[in-house]
Regions:
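Structured soluble/peripheral alpha/beta segments that form catalytic or ligand/cofactor-binding pockets
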Residues: 1-216
Length: 216
């Protein structure tokens, strides 16, 4: 005989596989939807540098695959690739694609080839405060939306380096921001987003997003 607690656990797991989260849940964990995206931005205010790293873990009819990206400014550098490997962690924030991209809440390791590498650890993280909902507010609890969004890391300092073209950037002390987006079918037809950090007040960070979101 199946115990009531087992029925409840199955029901909650099925609910979360739609992409939704109950109030006070943890939206950082993978949901098992078609796309789980992870994004980091590093801002070195003192040296006038910025870079981003991203991984999108996708679930297709032939199995998981991932899109990977690394970009830098002011030296123009952009590397984007796709791989047949991809994993999003259902127990905590974490994603990987073989040895090309390995990341969790405290580190990001990217190796997309010569001139496109990143290795950082996060110190003094400033996480999203414990609250009823994440960045998508009450829409987190609505099942089967095509897009959810959550800025889980509002600030912190990094230790590490980046290989940008023929340069090696020292990133110790730079600021970091991290977010996650997920949904049943990738990005909506319309989506806009912005994020800023590197202010004189190192605790200040701004992020916003919006788009055409549908359910079903």
């Amino acid at each position: 005989m199946t115990r009531p607690s087992a029925y409840l656990s199955r029901a909650l797991a099925a609910y979360r596989r739609t992409g939704a989260d109950l109030p006070y849940g943890d939206p950082r964990r993978a949901h098992g939807v078609a796309m789980e995206g992870y994004f980091w931005r590093v801002t070195d205010r003192d040296r006038g540098r910025s870079l981003i790293a991203l991984i999108g873990v996708n679930r297709g009819p032939r199995g998981p695959w991932a899109t990977l990206g690394l970009a830098a400014w002011p030296d123009p550098a952009l590397t984007v690739t796709a791989t047949t490997q991809g994993y999003a962690d259902p127990a905590r924030l974490g994603a990987r694609a073989g040895s090309a991209f390995v990341a969790d809440e405290r580190r990001v390791e990217v190796d997309l080839g010569p001139g496109a590498r990143l290795s950082i650890e996060v110190d003094e993280p400033l996480p999203w405060p414990q609250a009823r909902f994440g960045g998508s507010s009450g829409f987190h609890s609505v099942p089967a939306l095509n897009q959810y969004w959550h800025p889980w890391l509002l600030g912190g300092r990094v230790r590490g380096t980046a290989e940008v073209g023929d340069q090696t950037w020292e990133l110790d002390g730079a600021q970091v921001y991290g977010e996650k987006n997920w949904g049943k079918g990738g990005f909506p037809d319309s989506w806009w987003w912005g994020q800023a950090q590197g202010f004189e007040d190192r605790g200040a960070s701004v992020a916003f997003a919006g788009g055409q979101v549908s359910a079903g």
